[in-house]
Amino acid sequence: MSLLENLSTTLSYSAESVAHFSELIDIQWIEASLTKTGKASIRKRKLPAEQVVWLVIGLALFRNQPIWYVVQQLDLVQGESNYCYPSATVQARQRLGQEPLAELFRTLSQSWLEGSLVKQEKYQDLQVFAVDGVIWAMPHTPDNFSHFGSSKGKAASATWPQARAVCLMNTQSHELIDAQLGDMSQGELTLAHRLSVPHDSITLFDRAYFSADFLMSWQEKAENSHWLMRAKDNLRYEVIEKYGQGDYLIQMPVSARAQKLNPTLGQTWQARLMEVEHEGKKRRYITSLINKEKYPKKTLVTLYIQRWEIELGFREIKSSLQEGMMLRSKLPELVYQEIWGVLIAYNLIRRQ
């Protein structure tokens, strides 16, 4: 099931399902996230910080229900009455902010990743991940539009403001390992630069991520960190060494603009180019894995086709998530908070 399909299933979850999900999150992780971000509740409230965290996750799991319904279904209010005014829940979310949800997402992702990798197959000796971007639409309020803008920019008229996220996914479990959020003025490459990647890994990218600066920096993010993607049709290169039929070590120029933005870049950089016939069409793939004996061309191409083009749902998201999933928050800080809640909820669904 794709990421989009899993996010869509959040429309049908019951309170019993959420109770099951709560068993997957150690309360100490929530408390640690609140303490680390300075958001732990000191005074007694009807909606203490720990409950507000669950409220935000619940909003992702009950996407078609009003906020008061989520509060009541999850029995979040402390005290004799289980009712809480909608304005009070908004204030509680504002007090919490986005930081505890972002911290909790990273805590859960890293903790679950360690357990998942023990049971998963690797490509040779490498863990396999994938990166791509997602766009969310939100209510058209002055604050949201001023902060986020849209794909048409902040000056042009647009139906909905939009937020961008770039995610790192485990291609076997389909759990999200890391994510970076931003407004529409920040491109996917900008956000992807901020991702953290585990060591001893290969990450699959769409062609939109082809950049000498980005890909070389990706290799430096962690020990033995590599990448694989489809090659652009207009790729400029010269062959340094021919490994075999349709398999080459190549050298490519680094643009003057890239060198100006990053003076540490040289004038050229190297990678491996592989050409194959797939479904009657010629396809080219480029990778940082240049050891042809350890990483045969056929296995690399198969890895990309099976793990990216067939299994992953990222491309579905880019074309349809904007219409299929509307955020509800009317303030930028709460938009970010809500997205972190959605990402946590998505990973919970993957683990059930």
Language-model-detected regions and their locations in the chain:
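Major-groove recognition helix of helix-turn-helix-like DNA-binding domains
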Residues: S81-Q98
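Single, function-defining residue in the core of a domain
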Residues: M1-I67, R93-L96, E103-W112, Y123-Q127, ...
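Glycine/small-residue-rich loop that forms an oxyanion/phosphate-binding "nest" at active or ligand-binding sites
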Residues: G115
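Noncatalytic, basic helical substrate-engagement surface that gates or grips nucleic-acid strands
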Residues: Y85, A130-V131
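DNA-recognition alpha helix
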Residues: Q65-N82
